[in-house]
Amino acid sequence: MEYTPTIGLEIHAELNTKTKMFCACKNDTDEKRPNVNICPICLGHPGILPVINKEAVKHVLKVGLSIGGKIGYFTEFDRKNYFYPDIPKGYQISQYKHPLIFGGELLGVKITRVHLEEDTARSAHLSSEASAKLDENYSLVD
């Protein structure tokens, strides 16, 4: 049996939008004060529904067209369940089965898909403390 090596890369790019991916909170990853730009959507409170950032969708569509990708006629978001400290709500909103863009190529490198997803919180591990601190300013940013 012969094997063919296959190399896959997952590249994350932070979109330059005024608000976060699924809420109206300010998208400011340079904010020095923790947990300033957060809301019940960022924290996953019960009964609160996310609303997609139209500006982010426009950016992804431009990227897709620039790489020769195809725009999906249908898209959907999934909740990927994670049990990590930097996702206190227990899930991440992401696209997988039905991304906005599929296919394309950049500098000879084939691209499978371009999709949107929220980022996790940023965790800080201080050497002087036994616990970690979370900054939700970064959640919902990608």
Task: Go through each PLM region and give its residues.
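Basic, nucleic-acid-interacting segments
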Residues: 1-142
